[in-house]
Amino acid sequence: MLNLIADQAWNPFAPFGVTSWEPFVANLIAFILMVVILRYLAFKPIQNVLEKRRQRIEEGEEMREESERQLASVKEQTHEMLVEAGEKGQEKIDAAKAAAARLLEEQEAEASRKAEEIIKKARQLAELEQQKEREALKEQFGQLVALAAAQVTGKMLTEEDQRRINREAIDSLDS
């Protein structure tokens, strides 16, 4: 009886059903080893994969924001170039009108006919120049949109993809 009381007094885990300390220590060591093994073989690789994924997502967001900034810049440049082309066309029209007025004073009938031809040619030239500027800007815009799409998606675009993106970008500019 004394041995039983002495064993219980010495073993603080007896109320929990642990009567011998050897299995408890063995289980504790096995648990600690399992935690260490899982940490290095499972948790660390999973954490590394999650960290790499988070970094890729951040890089993708940065590229998207940069693409949006570039797109806004291209739109602004396109608008400025169109305004400039319109001003140049208007200057040419104004110059043609002034030339027509001088010719009108010198030769009434023939000057009138020549002035109309000059005005018509100036308008056609202005429209042609403006159209060329628009086409060049559309092509440049399409290329930048394709480049931005390639950066955002992170893959090389095929020629068909680039043509489709160019068409969509040009259609969005026209509307």
UniProtKB/Swiss-Prot annotation:
Subunit details: F-type ATPases have 2 components, F(1) - the catalytic core - and F(0) - the membrane proton channel. F(1) has five subunits: alpha(3), beta(3), gamma(1), delta(1), epsilon(1). F(0) has three main subunits: a(1), b(2) and c(10-14). The alpha and beta chains form an alternating ring which encloses part of the gamma chain. F(1) is attached to F(0) by a central stalk formed by the gamma and epsilon chains, while a peripheral stalk is formed by the delta and b chains.
Transmembrane segments: 18-38
Similarity comment: family membership: Belongs to the ATPase B chain family.
Organism of derivation: Akkermansia muciniphila (strain ATCC BAA-835 / DSM 22959 / JCM 33894 / BCRC 81048 / CCUG 64013 / CIP 107961 / Muc)
Coiled coil spans: none
GO cellular component terms, A-Z: plasma membrane; proton-transporting ATP synthase complex
Species lineage: Bacteria, Pseudomonadati, Verrucomicrobiota, Verrucomicrobiia, Verrucomicrobiales
GO molecular function per UniProt: proton-transporting ATP synthase activity, rotational mechanism; proton-transporting ATPase activity, rotational mechanism
The name this protein goes by in its record: ATP synthase subunit b
Cellular compartments annotated: Cell inner membrane
Cross-referenced PANTHER family: ATP SYNTHASE SUBUNIT B, ATP SYNTHASE SUBUNIT B', CHLOROPLASTIC
One Pfam family in the UniProt entry: ATP-synt_B
Keywords, in A-Z order: ATP synthesis, Cell inner membrane, Cell membrane, CF(0), Hydrogen ion transport, Ion transport, Membrane, Transmembrane, Transmembrane helix, Transport
Membrane-related topology note: Single-pass membrane protein
Known role: F(1)F(0) ATP synthase produces ATP from ADP in the presence of a proton or sodium gradient. F-type ATPases consist of two structural domains, F(1) containing the extramembraneous catalytic core and F(0) containing the membrane proton channel, linked together by a central stalk and a peripheral stalk. During catalysis, ATP synthesis in the catalytic domain of F(1) is coupled via a rotary mechanism of the central stalk subunits to proton translocation.
Domain of life from the UniProt record: Bacteria
